Structure formats: C-alpha cells, structure tokens
C-alpha cells in the first residue's frame, strides 16, 4: 500500500486545491517542484528551498544512476540523506532523458540501450531497472518508465509509442510491487496531441492502477493551444481522487493555464536555468538583467517582493554588474528570486481556489502583464 494520501479540499471551475500527505511531510497543491537534477537545486542550499515555500523537490533518476551511482547514494541511505533534504522527493524514471539522447539510443521491447553522456559506455535501462534504481533512491513518488512521444509525430508513430509505454507501465507496476516499495507510483499518460490516443493511454493506465497520473509528452515543442487542448480533453477523464502532474511545463503562464485545467503538480528547470541566464520572473513580466537600461536602475528585481534578493535591497544595477562579471552571486540571487516568485504564484493560486476567486486571480495575473486573459473552453474572448 502506498504511503501517499491525497485530499481534494476545494475546486473553483476546473482548478483544484488539495493536499498530498507523506510520512516525510505534507505538500499543498497546486504545487511547483524545483528540479534538483544531480541531487541539488542549482545554486541554493536545501534550507533555502524550504524557506522559499517549496515542500517537494524532483530528482533525476537517469543522471544520479550514471553519477555518482547507486553504491554512493546507498551509502547515505538514499537520496534524502545524500542531498540533506528531509521533505518529499519525486524521481523521474529516466525516460525523458533517454528520449533527449535521440541519435545515441536504441529502443526495443525490453527497454533502451544508449551511450552514457558521462563516459560513452553502453548502458541499458528498462522498466525493471528504473524501478530498482528508484527503490535505492528511496523517493516518495516513483515515476513509471515510459517512452516520451516526440513532437511532431504521426498518429501511427504516437500510437506505437503509447502502446509500448503501456506495456512498460505494467512492467513498472509489477517490478515496483515485487520490490516491496511502498512509495507512490505514478502512471504517465502519453499519446502525443491525439485525443483518442490520450484516452486509450489513460484507460490502460487506470486498468493497471496507479497512485497518481502524470501527463507526459507536452513539453516537447508543441504549440500552447495543442497542449491546452490535451489538458481539456483529459480533465473530465482523469480520476478526481488522484493527483495530476503535468511534467516539465513551467512558464508562469503555463502554470496558471494548467491549474485552470485541473493540474495539481508541476516541475520545470525554467526558474533556475533562466536565473543563470539573467532572466528574472516578476508579476509584470520578465526582467532581462543584461539589457543596458538596467545599468543604473536602483530598483530591486520586483519592488515589494519578499525574496532574499529583493528584501535585502540588491538593485537591478548591482545584479547586472554581477552578471556581466560572471560572479556566482548573480545566479544565486536570481535563483532565490525566481523560485520565490514561482512558489508565491502557487500559494496565491491555492488561496484563490479556496476562496472561490480563481477567475478573478487569473484575470489579474494577465492584466499585470498588460495581456488579455485567454478564454477558457465555454468562454468568449
């Protein structure tokens, strides 16, 4: 039996306010999970992550398996001890990273053989191997091993990929249970941008039975309207009593639109990666700190923001100087700000759903950016 409990506390339209409960802690939803690819969220300490409002982080099975390897992580009792993070952790299965290798992999019914990006060695990864790795990592949410359907993909290619992922889903379930792992196991809905394939994928996953359902293959270059159409198609079909996770999607607008379509969980490298490139998220849009107009700008990134960078008074001028000099403090402060912004955005959406004001929140979100609120299904612009 899984250690995960999910309680749906409120709805407003399709937006959902809930709570995930694990032995290691509670996660309020909708939630954004900072990505710690190699066991750390780049540039900040675990205690900073918690102070920013994050309650769960993501670890990368593929990269941690290759480096430092399971023996080293096992010496620490798992990923929590290794990374010094005592809250819940979700680990992906490695499927997306294998997908991203493109020309360096070979997919068969059994799994995927690929050249390691670290040393070029041939490595095999399949459902059973992924479940064994995640058992050693001792994550709180385990993802099944799947094939991420590319975009664009013909319907025939998307169908064959989805059917392979379903067979791997059953093997993942069997291996996870066979290992006696009581962590939550999430299925991943595939099928590209084809509604009928998405329905078939979800039906197959539900017949196997999972603790939560992720929506995969929607951060691979598809237009926003096609992504939203798939979320709208899946919303009434996904089991209301289970958490829903939109994988790898993470612009602020994407989070708002995902929540509006019933998504509970998100992850993305965008807030941390963009911080390292001098792009800082605010309620009025993105501050691109390398622009010359910020050279003598004495404002903080976002006046009134409660993050460490803004509340301490670091100016845009100073941050631009640090960035131009390649000082490591620039991405550190930028990361603190961006993750604070993301976590506050999620907290504000949770409050709006609970109070029945999500429609007004969504309008205000776009108005602050000088943008028109895009209509939801059934609305007119």
Swiss-Prot record:
GO terms for biological process: queuosine biosynthetic process; tRNA wobble guanine modification; tRNA-guanine transglycosylation. GO terms for cellular component: cytosol. Zn(2+) binds at residues 305, 307, 310, 337. Keywords: Glycosyltransferase, Metal-binding, Queuosine biosynthesis, Transferase, tRNA processing, Zinc. Coiled coil: none annotated. Homodimer. Within each dimer, one monomer is responsible for RNA recognition and catalysis, while the other monomer binds to the replacement base PreQ1. Catalyzes the base-exchange of a guanine (G) residue with the queuine precursor 7-aminomethyl-7-deazaguanine (PreQ1) at position 34 (anticodon wobble position) in tRNAs with GU(N) anticodons (tRNA-Asp, -Asn, -His and -Tyr). Catalysis occurs through a double-displacement mechanism. The nucleophile active site attacks the C1' of nucleotide 34 to detach the guanine base from the RNA, forming a covalent enzyme-RNA intermediate. The proton acceptor active site deprotonates the incoming PreQ1, allowing a nucleophilic attack on the C1' of the ribose to form the product. This is Queuine tRNA-ribosyltransferase.
